[in-house]
């Protein structure tokens, strides 16, 4: 038996590429893999300038090439970027010459579908958009009614699925609970995220494959404990630790700064972030910058997002669908230590670094902080983090190393209050500021 259905944010239906009007370009600054089927199709093109250009622009993968080298999961070929790190098949107007001359059917799969992201869990499609596209980031983040969930129809016989996952009815129930948690504004967003963490712990305590009876009881018990305030994790015990937050943001951003291609748009955001937290010749230590980070949050970030609560909610929902949270990678990419709690830690890493960068950018622009700054920050940071195949593992391992995995660590990373919080405990005495690691050299895209 299989169940077909769709979890579809409204924005996946609304997206339309704006072409040469776009302030960025998806034809550069990263690897563009070419599948074997696309390559073979290119070989059928008649001789001419386009065929010559395509042949000169494709680099076949050497033996042992991996996804992180830009050749994609298939490991067959990729576009050989030019000296400006842009696709040489792009026209002077910024448009794809393959698309314009022979049509979209000749595009490699990544070029044909980007920024749409398709994820399948037991036959249920989960559609999202890659926020590395500026127009996608706009329609995902800025629409107050951005998503809707379409329940699957009755089960039908047909396909079978070999994924090491529970049956489809359990998956749909878990997906529904997860999305309802994120969108429930009866609780502040940091508490909603911790609710997700508690749920992940409870799912991991179930027998393997999350049997339907046990999983249904787990979800019912979870809903009840949230409703009556008897959740196993004491939200009131969470300390506010802006120093731990800033330290983690700097380390996470610096981690990818060493591995990813940094675009000029992202450099602008990093420069604004540094300005917003008060980085300068006489302020370079973590201790000296924490006060600026806290001020940026309390005076500019928090008031803005209190007026626009849907922005971070939409970011989380899109990330949940894009990353198949809490189910994790598909079978091909699933590792032996997969767990819902591990997926939660990775989700917190995504959210923490994005939120931390936005806090600094808000501090730089102060009262002028706007949705345009949000879109640029999220889009350019997503281009750096979300498309790097090593980020989930590196980010998870970093938070484990810092002791910020699981619920207590997540709580320290995501809770900020201007007043009424518990006294800050002395978790660490680090005097090292990692901002110099973030002084990237921009690639010219």
Regions found by a protein language model. Name each.
Residues 135-224:
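Charged, amphipathic alpha-helical linkers/stalks
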Residues 9, 25, 29-57:
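Low-complexity, highly charged intrinsically disordered N-terminal segments
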Residues 32-41, 108-109, 122-127, 144-148:
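Short cysteine/histidine-rich zinc-coordinating motifs and their immediately flanking basic loops
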Residues 1-11, 52-96, 104-109, 113:
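Short, charged low-complexity linear segments at domain edges
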Residues 188-445:
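Hydrophobic, aromatic-lined core segments that form the binding pocket/scaffold
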Residues 48-84, 120-169:
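Short Fe-S-cluster ligation motifs
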Residues 14-32, 82-117, 130-137:
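Local cysteine-cluster metal-coordination motifs and their immediate loop/turn environment
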Residues 30, 99-103, 121, 162-166, ...:
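Conserved aromatic-histidine-acidic binding/catalytic patches
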């Amino acid at each position: 038996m299989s169940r077909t259905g769709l979890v579809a944010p409204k924005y996946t239906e609304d997206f339309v590429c704006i072409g040469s009007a776009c302030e960025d370009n998806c034809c550069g600054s990263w690897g563009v893999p070419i599948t074997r089927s696309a390559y073979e199709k290119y070989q059928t093109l008649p001789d001419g300038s386009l065929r010559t250009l395509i042949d000169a622009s494709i680099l076949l993968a050497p033996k042992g090439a991996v996804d992180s080298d830009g050749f994609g999961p298939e490991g067959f070929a990729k576009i050989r970027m030019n000296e400006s790190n842009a696709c040489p098949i792009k026209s002077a107007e910024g448009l794809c010459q393959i698309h314009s001359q022979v049509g979209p059917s000749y595009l490699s799969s990544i070029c044909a579908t980007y920024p749409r992201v398709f994820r399948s869990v037991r036959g249920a499609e989960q559609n999202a958009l890659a926020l590395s596209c500026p127009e996608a980031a706009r329609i995902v983040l800025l629409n107050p009614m951005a998503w809707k969930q379409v329940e699957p129809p009755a089960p039908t016989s047909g396909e079978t699925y070999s994924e090491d996952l529970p049956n489809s009815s359990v998956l749909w129930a878990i997906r529904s609970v997860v999305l309802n948690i994120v969108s429930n504004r009866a609780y502040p967003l940091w508490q909603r995220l911790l609710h997700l963490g508690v749920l992940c712990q409870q799912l991991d305590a179930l027998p393997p494959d999350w049997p339907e009876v046990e999983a249904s009881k787990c979800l019912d018990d979870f809903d009840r404990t949230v409703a009556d305030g008897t959740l196993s994790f004491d939200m009131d015990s969470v300390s506010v630790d802006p120093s731990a937050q800033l330290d983690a943001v700097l380390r996470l951003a610096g981690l990818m700064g060493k591995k990813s291609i940094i675009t000029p748009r992202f450099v602008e955001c990093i420069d604004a972030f540094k300005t917003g937290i008060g980085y300068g010749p006489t302020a370079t230590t973590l201790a000296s910058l924490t006060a600026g980070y806290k001020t940026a949050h309390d005076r500019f970030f928090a008031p803005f997002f209190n007026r626009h609560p849907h922005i971070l909610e939409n970011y989380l929902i899109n990330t949940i669908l894009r990353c198949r949270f809490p189910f994790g990678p598909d079978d091909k990419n699933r590792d032996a230590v997969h767990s819902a709690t591990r997926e939660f830690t990775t989700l917190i890493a995504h959210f923490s670094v994005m939120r931390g960068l936005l806090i600094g950018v808000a501090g730089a622009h102060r009262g002028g902080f706007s949705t345009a700054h949000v879109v640029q920050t999220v889009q350019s940071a997503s281009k750096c983090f979300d498309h790097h195949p090593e980020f989930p593992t590196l980010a998870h391992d970093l938070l484990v190393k810092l002791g910020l995995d699981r619920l207590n660590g997540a709580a320290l990373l995501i809770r900020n209050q201007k007043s009424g919080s518990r006294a800050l405990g002395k978790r660490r005495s680090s005097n090292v500021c990692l901002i110099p690691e973030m002084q990237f050299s921009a690639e010219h895209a």
